[in-house]
Amino acid sequence: MEIRERILADMQVAETIDAHEEIRKSVEFLKAYLKKNTFLKSFVLGISGGQDSTLTGKLAQMAISEMRAETGDDEYQFFAVSLPYGTQLDESDRQDALNFMEPDNRLTVNIKASVDASVAALAEAGVELSDFAKGNEKARERMKVQYAIAAMHKGVVVGTDHSAEAVTGFYTKYGDGGTDINPLFRLNKRQGKALLKELGCPEHLYLKKPTADLEDNKPALPDEVALGVTYDQIDDYLEGKEVPADAAAKIENWFIKTEHKRHMAITIFDDFWK
């Protein structure tokens, strides 16, 4: 199997979608997981104010609201968690996203003290973190907090990973990539926008430039700059359309380089890396 065939098979992106149907598919998927695992009662999600967490949060709240209505069990709850490192530059967008999704519970946990303490402890041990490595510390601290909240509310942590992100491995291993359930996987970036439009989301939340915003020295660095390829090109590639050869090569290189992120810890029986 050629590399592109393998990528398209792995990422499961349809050439065209019906936004309403995909919304229902994600909501029913989330509900089915709770129905199968009756000891689970909540979803927990970190909210940044970007497209992916806005969409995921709205879908998670819809699923939880429907579970309450269907079962009469008020223990079903959605926890939307703001996790700033100090002060977030686009805090107004996060508030707009929260107002759009109308979560049952809003929590704020500032991760700055925890991250800075880890950085200082490592420095004391002779390990000076680069700005990039510190950025990954932020992502992992955010996930640690979400799992702590989930542990106290019979919950699972919902991920925002979609296929345009998964193909490039553009997330932190065991950070924002370390979640329990990903309702957006199979969608690319433009398809996620289509779902938000269908849901009546404020336009500025899905038109803003995507950024991981993890590095102190490169605040709000656009994803497309970091990747060296645009989301339109990634989306076209995943839909089986023609893309420039250099863009295809970059996408395929990212896919190969980040293969380890799409697997749990490697065992002696794994051979994808050989």
Curated annotation (Swiss-Prot):
Gene Ontology molecular function terms on file: ATP binding; glutaminase activity; metal ion binding; NAD+ synthase (glutamine-hydrolyzing) activity; NAD+ synthase activity
InterPro entries xref list: NAD/GMP_synthase, NAD_synthase, NH(3)-dep_NAD(+)_synth, Rossmann-like_a/b/a_fold
Enzyme Commission code(s) on record: 6.3.1.5
Pathway: Cofactor biosynthesis; NAD(+) biosynthesis; NAD(+) from deamido-NAD(+) (ammonia route): step 1/1
Binding locations of ATP: 46-53, 160, 189, 211
GO-annotated cellular components: cytoplasm
GO biological process terms, semicolon-separated: NAD biosynthetic process
Domain of life, source organism: Bacteria
Pfam families per the UniProt record, alphabetical: NAD_synthase
Binding-site residues for Mg(2+), renumbered to this chain: 52, 165
Keyword Metal-binding listed: yes
UniProt subunit comment: Homodimer.
Family: Belongs to the NAD synthetase family.
Name of the protein described by the UniProt record: NH(3)-dependent NAD(+) synthetase
Organism of this sequence: Listeria monocytogenes serotype 4a (strain HCC23)
